[in-house]
């Protein structure tokens, strides 16, 4: 092979190698907000004329706005289990809402979205209501969440209402979630 042909093939090889290489993209940030007792058109971004939700509207405008979706069940524990596992609640054996000191909770053998995110080097946190069991083996920090601050089920929130010296639990949950979001990835 002569020198000219070698140069020609070298240039073609370099173009081919660099042209075919895929640039490494940064993983997207994921912020998932789940609200209780919210109907389809309760947010102004979905048509409500009664409730103003400017911050959620802005998030919907800049992110993903879902218009066709299905709630697996209309109760807390079952719905949360479905969202975190991708399974029907009945397949998980969850058909209602867990109460305080329940012997039941999310099966430790189920693979949760939080665990899949951890496997892909995401920093995970949950701030608010868990409602998937309050025994140690059911806690969110044992299911792929790095941080948790909130309530374990619904029935415990009323004893804190209306006042606590350190403020409303919702305000503290919001504050801690904002700190979590703003911290750099580990």
What is each of the regions a protein language model found here?
Residues 2-4, 8-10, 20-182:
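Formylglycine-dependent sulfatase
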